[in-house]
Curated annotation (Swiss-Prot):
Gene Ontology BP terms: rRNA base methylation
GO MF, one annotated term: 23S rRNA (adenine(1618)-N(6))-methyltransferase activity
Pfam family, one: Methyltransf_10
Role, per record: Specifically methylates the adenine in position 1618 of 23S rRNA.
Family indicated by similarity: Belongs to the methyltransferase superfamily. METTL16/RlmF family.
Start and end residues of each stretch annotated as Disordered: 1-53
Highest taxon listed in the record's lineage: Bacteria
GO CC terms: cytoplasm
Organism: Shewanella sp. (strain MR-7)
Name of the gene encoding the protein in the UniProt record: rlmF
The protein's name in its UniProt record: Ribosomal RNA large subunit methyltransferase F
Basic residues compositional bias, start-end: 33-53
Cell compartment(s), UniProt: Cytoplasm
Biased composition (Low complexity): 1-17
Gene3D superfamilies per the UniProt record, alphabetical: Vaccinia Virus protein VP39
Amino acid sequence: MPKPAIKTAAKPATSSAGKRGKPNTPKSVAKPKTAKPKTASKPKVKPGEKKRLHPRNLHINGYDFPALMASYPKLKAFVRPTPYGALSIDFADPLAVKTLNAALLLHHYGLAFWDIPKGALCPPIPGRVDYLHYLADLLFEGGKVKRAAAIRALDIGTGANGVYAILGHQVYDWQFVASDINPQSLTNVQRIIDNNPSLQGHLSLRRQQDDKAVFKGIIQASDRFELTLCNPPFHGSLKEASEGSLRKVRNLQLNRGEQPKATSATLNFGGQAAELWCQGGEKQFLATMIRESQAFAEQCLWFTSLVSKQENLKPCYQALEKLGVDTVKTIEMQQGNKFTRVLAWSFHSQAKRLQWRNQIVSGT
C-alpha cells in the first residue's frame, strides 16, 4: 500500500497563509515570522452545566447492573442498592471495581478474559473509551467515522490493564502497538491477549528500556501510525501519588456520608509506580513527549495525550509553537466530577492529513 508523501517535519509553516511554497515576501521586508500553529478546541463547559460522555459512548446513561450481572454473575457479590433506589458498587473497593470492569468488557466489548495484578491501576472504562471516541472524531475531521483495520495506533504506557489498545481494537478495529517500561505490566497484557482470540494478531507489545524516553526506542524506522495516545503519569513523586490516592478515597467516603478513613486495602487508585508518577510529573513527561515527537513527525499523523492539569497546557502550547507544528487541538472531556482534556498536534497540513487518512481507509 503506497504511503502519502509527507514533507520533512522540521520545516515550519511560513507566513504565506499556511502554504508550504515560497512566501511572497517583499525584498524590503525581513525574514517572515514562523506562523503560529492553527488551534481548535471543543467549547468549554459553562458553570453549572454537566457535560455528558461522548454521544457514541455506550455508558452515556450509566451502568445497566441487571444486564451486567446476567452476563458476568461474579459481579452480583459486589452490587448493592443505594439510598436513592439505584444499584451500584463500592468504588473504593479495588476488587469490586476490577469485577465491574471485567463485566463491562465482557458485556459490551466481547472480552472473555480480563484481569490485572494486585496494586495495578484499575481504569474506569467509560472515561477510557471516551478518549478513543474523540480520537476517532479527530482522525476523520468532521467526516463519518468508520471502523478501519488499516488504522494503526500507538499506546504509550499501556500499563498492566492494556485497556486503550483493547478497547480501540474492539470498538474501531484499529491495530495497536502498546508500550510500557514495566515488564510485568506487559506480561499481564500478553496474558489478556492470549486468552482473547479477538485480540490475537491485532495487538503487539514493546518494552521501553529508557525511563527518560517516550517515543525513542519504541517507534521503529518502518513504523507509521495514524494516532499516538497516552495517559501520562501525573504525579512527580511516590509521596504525591499516595496522597492523591488517599484524597480520592476520602472524597468517595464523604460522598457516601461515611467517616473518612483509608487503608492500603481500600486504595483502588494506587497503581504501580510507572503508572502514576515519574520524575517531574505530568509536566515533564509532556515536555519530553512533545520534544521527541518532532523526530517522528513523518511517521505519525496525530500525536495526542491526556492532560490532567489545566496549568500544564500553556507550556505545551509554547513548546509546540517552537517546533513549528501545523495544527494543535484541545478537546475537553468530563466524566462525572473529573475534568480532563486531550491535547492533539500534527505536523501536517489538513490537506496532507486528509490524503494520508483517505489512502489508509480506502486501502489504496
